Amino acid sequence: MNEKLALSDDILMKIEKPARYIGNEVNAVVKDLNNIDVRFCMCFPDVYEIGMSHLGIQILYGMLNSWDDVWCERVYSPWVDLDAIMRKENIPLFALESQDPVKNFDFLGITIQYEMCYTNILQVLDLAQIPLLAEERGDDCPIVIGGGPCTYNPEPIADFFDIFYIGEGETQYRPLIDLYKKCREEKVGREEFLRRAAKLPGMYVPRFYETAYHEDGTIASFRPTEEGISATIRKELVTDMTDSFYPMKPVVPYIKVTQDRVVLEIQRGCIRGCRFCQAGQLYRPVRERDVEILKKYAMEMLKNTGHEEISLSSLSSSDYSKLPELIDFLMEECNKRHINISLPSLRIDAFSLDVMSKVQDVKKSSLTFAPEAGSQRLRDVINKGLTEEVILQGSALAFEGGWTRVKLYFMLGHPTETEEDIRGIAELSNKIAATFFDTVPKEKRVNGRVQIVTSTSFFVPKPFTPFQWAPQCTKEEFVEKAYLTRKAISEQLNQKSIKYNWHEADVSVLEGVLARGDRRLSQVLLYVYHKGCFYDAWSEYFHNDVWMEAFAACGLDPDFYSHRERPLDEILPWDFLDCGVSRAFLEREWQKAKNETISPNCKQACQGCGAARFGCGICVEPRG
């Protein structure tokens, strides 16, 4: 236990939730500085409660600390109240475990999960008193390394990072740290370390690449500036999930966080191939963990944390081949210990409903469907393997089982979307409500009514998806679509049973710009940050007018990045990365979308996406 605190009692008493900053949580790792060689600070650039809920941080934290020569600590974005105090009193950002300044570490690793956290990256660097621009850092600064899904287009933030780790973090940190130690022994400086790091698999060092542009703003070329540095960086991948590291002693916070439970990752990847979904492409191929190992992990983590709930983590839990066996085991063991089980990402069918009725309070819980589009035509465009018949059958089974609350998730603005598709959202919501009244006798209806919560987000095209070439709607178009949805719901027979929620259009448009932007956007990020923008993912701190001012000041048009269809022969900012899925496959899927043609999932038939080259997972298993 570390008794030192970077913040005085006076400051801790002034701020919201001081437990965010004092460390010493259950299973936090403290090491003797005299016995380690490398100090690594792992950062999630958002508030503590969100960062502490992220499984990837827990995996890397546990893995790095399993090595005797490394001490990995954590840091999160200070909330706005402490941010103001730290600036006023010149308190440098500190790591939780040692309470030492982050600027004194060897590495600062930042996981980047969401584009709207980009300004928080600048906040972290600024509060840590590390120069924002990588080119301005000297040998006394930490190596700033970024990872996570947003690094599959790292260009908008390339100027702020020394290294991007492309792919899954379990494979290359050991070679990177060994290289760092070797360079330190040889007394070579930062530049030479980065030059050597750029030759490691999965490492992208932006300073050794340059971009040229056409007069119209599109990319003319992107190439390395030195010999021996690869023009293409291939993602890192864990080929055997069963043997890969998993944290048996995850850190347990003192305050309630977003995901306050044991998280058991049962598999990585998804077989479904939804054309809008970036995760479904990035994490190919699907790789399962052995069910016996998962049983052991579950019991060990529950024992080591004292958590009262366990959740299965996967993009599509229903596709895990040993799910019935695993759930039977967990139900038996967790019932003995009065542990709750959370089962997200399940398809709603008879098996799932039977399981959920045993592990949830039916009267209090709600069922979730994600049709994503209102019509079957548009669901075929996006390759969402879910028919209206399946949704209504699942709803009927659920209502028979006692459920009275249903959540529906849709996206507005998919490519080729029409007014008829949008009206389909209201019509499907109404049909589900009607199914309740047709299925449940009047005397058995709780409060006499079903609750349908229909939510729409706005479509954001992402790199390495078949829709990476698609235009995004403007803010005005998005708002018009949301109003049309609301009006159509109000016209339904069962409209009193339907509640409608929709997302902020400004944020979705900006997310789209940052998701498919190039290196020139770094000047926009610097502009808005210096104007006071951070925590842009939080609506109360998002200032769209400042962002629009920044684009104008920097001579950049946000519509160039979002509101145009990109030709197939255009060089995209992320084309130098190899995510395992081929460009030819994405082009085929883009054409299939335009033709309203579906593709079978990976278990039904291989679509030749390119992931088979990794020689693991679903790609080497028999299909049927």
Label each PLM-derived region with a short phrase.
Residues Y48-G51, V80-D83, M116-Y118, T151-P154, ...:
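Flexible loop/turn segments at secondary-structure boundaries
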Residues H54, K256-E292, G608-R623:
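Canonical Radical SAM [4Fe-4S] cluster-binding loop centered on the CxxxCxxC motif
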Residues D69-D81:
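A short beta-strand-loop structural module common to alpha/beta enzyme folds
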Residues P78-R223, P466-D518, L525-E540:
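Glycine-rich beta-alpha loop elements in corrinoid/cobalamin-binding modules
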Residues M42-C43, M116, E300-K407, M411-V453, ...:
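Conserved SAM/AdoMet-binding glycine-rich loop
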Residues I11-C41, Y48-E49, P206, Y213-V263, ...:
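N-terminal [4Fe-4S]-dependent radical SAM core
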Residues M1-V30, N34, F40-M42, E491-G624:
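Radical SAM enzyme core and accessory elements
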Residues F40-D46, L64, V251-Q278, L302, ...:
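N-terminal pre-triad scaffold of radical SAM enzymes
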